[in-house]
Amino acid sequence: MTLGQFGGLFVVYLISVIFILSLTWMEFRRVRFNFNVLFSLLYLLTFYFGFPFTCVLVFRFGVEVVPVQYLLQAMLSATAFYAVYYVSYKTRLRQKTSVPRAPLLTVNRVEANLTWLLLALIAVATVGIFFLNNGFLLFKLRSYSQIFSSDVSGVALKRFFYFFIPAMLVVYFLRQTQRAWLLFLIGTVAFGMLTYVIVGGTRANLIIAFALFLFIGIVRGWITLWMLVAAGIFGIVGMFWLALKRYGLDVSGDYAFYTFLYLTRDTFSPWENLALLWQNYDKIEFQGLAPIARDFYVFIPSWLWPDRPNLVLNSANYFTWEVLNNHSGLAISPTLLGSLVVMGGVLFIPLGAIAVGLVIKWFDWVYELGKNDSNRYKAAILQAFCFGAVFNIIVLTREGVDSFVSRVVFFCLIFGLCLLVAKLLYWLLESAGLIRQRLRRMRATPLAPTPNTVQDPVIKEQI
């Protein structure tokens, strides 16, 4: 990359970032937080945050990168995708109505508490089983890729660890105090550190816990944008340190700076992977929607499907094995746009942008239902569901459409199953006479009795 080429890329980069940041800032000032703001920030992080790191690696350390024309193509396609996405998100599909509708879901106090207990039980039980089978893998494995080897049993259990976070989200949304907010951080980060040590380097639970803590703080006005920036810097440094421990690296001096640059870029902003796909575009055999179906294979236990393929050719594995010819055992993220390119080439990019806009709109609709519901238990469940799905939005931007679809379906099934079981348990307990009504009197300022006033309203709660 020459200085002239860098200058041209920088102009395109600046225009793209200003365009996306302007739209995101307007939305932030309007609503402070919604899933459009979240997706936009994650999109900026994935496709634009890594450009400065790439430039420093090129000019400071002489690292060879993808030819400039493909880097430019990656930037332009990312910006075009966001423009189509934004139009799709903002397009109203039906007229807004103020007519109240009958609630599709009702949740009481007992059901809400049973739901978070079941979610937490799933997470803790699967962590316990994984630990009994494998011990502390962080101190046993020589490389991170060994996690996926036959020596490690119960790898599928890792997918259940995450449900501890939605459980703690329900607890927080039932109270929504600063104390509950801080306890959420302490509990989820402690659990994330435990899973990091047991699994041998999986940082996802830690990243999500910290990110959700920050998002809740922004929504409630407990942290400012400057505090968010400081927390982001702290998070980047923390993730770099954990990556060093994961890969067993001992670095110092210039090499430490070099390692920081490429690990941080690859962790938060694998945008060069999209450029690699454009470079190898003529070699790609478009997979259609097959990667989405194949990604569900990993959720089917081998005892249920004895002939299940051990190697799943989703978009990440296709990119890693067929495009990069990399068989190290780790799948390399193709990004959201990369997965669309693998599935259907250029034509799938605008179609994917429209679909993503509708998905984000749906999450915002559910989130608004939760915020505005008068039943605080139902509101807590809906908001916890939406915030719990943040991990799936991260998967969408970083890993791709196929990984997102399989994980969001899995998340909805487990969350919905826990709520259904909670309702069934409540019905059984109530039928057995173990649920009693708690009468709570609303204290009001004494007023002179009038024919139209009602003294001491009574509210019933199940305990």
Swiss-Prot record:
| UniProt keywords, alphabetically | Cell inner membrane, Cell membrane, Membrane, Transmembrane, Transmembrane helix
Q: Disulphide bridges in this chain?
A: none
Pathway as given in its UniProt record: Bacterial outer membrane biogenesis; enterobacterial common antigen biosynthesis
Give coiled-coil spans as residue ranges: none
Please tell me where this protein is predominantly located: membrane
Q: According to its record, what are the GO cellular component terms?
A: plasma membrane
Q: Which residues cross the membrane?
A: 6-26, 39-59, 65-85, 112-132, 154-174, 180-200, 201-221, 222-242, 340-360, 377-397, 408-428
Asked whether the UniProt record includes Acetylation among its keywords, one would answer no
A Gene Ontology biological process in which this protein takes part is: enterobacterial common antigen biosynthetic process
The keyword Cell wall biogenesis/degradation appears for this protein: no
Name the Pfam families on file: WzyE (PF06899)
Localization, UniProt: Cell inner membrane
Q: Which InterPro entries match?
A: WzyE
Its biological purpose: Probably involved in the polymerization of enterobacterial common antigen (ECA) trisaccharide repeat units.
Annotated family: Belongs to the WzyE family.
Q: How does it assemble?
A: Probably part of a complex composed of WzxE, WzyE and WzzE.
Record protein name field: Probable ECA polymerase
